[in-house]
């Protein structure tokens, strides 16, 4: 066995641990992500330009994506509980910064810490599930983990809009701090676990730096390219730099093998590779819901609460279908739900793109498309996540989970 557990007595995952894990995941997906729906409210009370505020909103996802694989490797090396605890601590500090922020400095720093928090929490908690749950118990635990991530992302617009409308947007992060503290309490007493073989390898600093450079340059190209001009020298420089850094990252990974930040041998498992690729594509598809929320506020003058209510259909269906997806997985295997989910999601994207429709009709179409999103993603989520976890080697479960969640 290549996973070391640090405990005097055998430990089996229980509901207390599972609730703590789900609450940990919610600190990012429910609270940190809710800023997407309250940008206008934050703009009115902060001394920050809209461009800077938009950058701040994307920073948490950017830093989470940059560091989630490295954090998964550190969880394998130093301990999954240790990284989960670190992530919750970063979430508390980052949320506190946002509560007191008046200008760009603290606000940007808080969003960065929230991203780093998510990078620590997501792979470490999936690794804890792989370590402490087996068989159907693992599939059930994965379902609830998925409810925390996919369900939290569906609820964040409504919760964020409701809190911002009723109490003010800063209270979103007060509640986030309270949830993080409760998660820390529930996770107390969980034995540590880590990979014996991972401790023999040093962190691949070169791979980490090249990955960060590639992701940052791609983000700048996508977010700033329109303003700079897609064919301007600056935009083309960003794109060329991203391609060069990506090439260096891949060559470094191929050369270092198991010692690389991402061991490309993981993708030899077709089931794991399919789960990672499809998860990447569907996570990108969720962006259409976020764009629709902003368009409903700025184009059709809905309030944050009203635009948040448009996602209730998604929330109900995704939460219902996540457990259905678990049952489909147990009865038919992962292939059927993992194929049906993207088809439903594609139909939802086509509907939500019909911005040329008259206001009342478009609002109805958006609500219906969100329902389809929930059906598709809920059907897909548990089979996909369980496939990634089940097919990851014990000594690389943190890294493998990080790669999966980087999407």
Regions found by a protein language model. Name each.
Residues 73-206, 233, 394:
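Helix-loop-helix hairpins in multi-pass membrane proteins, especially solute transporters
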Residues 1-30, 44:
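Cytosolic juxtamembrane N-terminal segment immediately preceding the first transmembrane helix
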Residues 16-31, 35-37, 206, 233-238, ...:
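12-transmembrane solute porter fold
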Residues 165-279, 285, 310:
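Hydrophobic transmembrane-helix bundles of small-molecule transporters
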Residues 45-47, 79, 100-106, 167-168, ...:
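Helix-breaking motifs and short loop linkers at transmembrane-helix boundaries and internal kinks
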Residues 42-43, 74-75, 159-167, 222, ...:
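Interfacial helix-cap and linker-helix signal at transmembrane-aqueous boundaries
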Residues 38-67, 106, 300, 305-310:
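Extracellular/periplasmic helix-loop-helix junction of adjacent transmembrane segments
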Residues 58-72, 122-126, 312-325:
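Central cavity-lining transmembrane alpha-helices of secondary-active solute carriers
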């Amino acid at each position: 066995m290549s996973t070391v557990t640090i405990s005097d007595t055998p430990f089996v995952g229980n509901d207390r641990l599972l609730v703590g894990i789900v609450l940990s995941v919610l600190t990012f997906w429910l609270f940190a992500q809710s800023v997407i729906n309250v940008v206008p409210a934050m703009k009115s009370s902060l001394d920050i330009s809209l461009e800077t505020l938009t950058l701040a909103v994307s920073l948490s996802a950017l830093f989470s994506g940059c560091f989630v694989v490295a954090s998964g490797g550190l969880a394998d090396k130093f301990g999954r509980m240790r990284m989960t605890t670190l992530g919750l601590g970063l979430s508390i500090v980052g949320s506190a910064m946002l509560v007191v922020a008046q200008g760009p400095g603290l606000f940007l720093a808080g969003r960065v810490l929230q991203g780093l928090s998510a990078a620590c929490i997501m792979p470490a908690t999936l690794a804890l599930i792989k370590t402490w749950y087996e068989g159907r118990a693992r599939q059930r635990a994965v379902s609830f983990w998925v409810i925390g991530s996919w369900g939290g992302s569906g609820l964040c617009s409504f919760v964020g809009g409701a809190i911002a409308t009723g109490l003010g947007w800063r209270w979103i992060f007060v509640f986030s701090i309270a949830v993080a503290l409760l998660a820390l309490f529930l996770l107390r007493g969980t034995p540590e676990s880590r990979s014996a073989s991972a401790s023999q390898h040093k962190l691949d600093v070169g791979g980490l730096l090249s990955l960060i450079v590639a992701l940052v340059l791609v983000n700048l190209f996508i977010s700033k390219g329109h303003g700079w001009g897609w064919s301007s020298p600056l935009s083309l420089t960003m794109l060329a730099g991203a391609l060069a850094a990506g090439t260096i990252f891949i060559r470094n990974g191929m050369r270092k093998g198991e010692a690389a930040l991402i061991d490309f041998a993981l993708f030899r498992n077709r089931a794991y590779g399919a789960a990672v690729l499809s998860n990447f594509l569907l996570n990108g598809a969720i962006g259409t819901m976020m764009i629709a929320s902003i368009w409903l506020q700025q184009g059709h003058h809905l309030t944050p609460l009203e635009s948040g209510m448009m996602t209730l259909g998604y929330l109900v269906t995704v939460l219902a279908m996540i457990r259905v997806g678990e049952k489909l997985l147990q009865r038919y295997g992962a292939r059927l739900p993992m194929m049906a989910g993207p088809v439903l999601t594609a139909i939802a994207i086509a509907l939500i793109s019909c911005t040329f429709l008259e206001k009342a009709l478009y609002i109805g179409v958006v609500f219906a498309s969100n329902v389809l999103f929930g059906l598709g993603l809920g059907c897909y989520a548990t089979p996909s996540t369980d496939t990634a976890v089940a097919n990851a080697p014990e000594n690389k479960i943190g890294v493998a989970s990080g790669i999966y969640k980087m999407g």
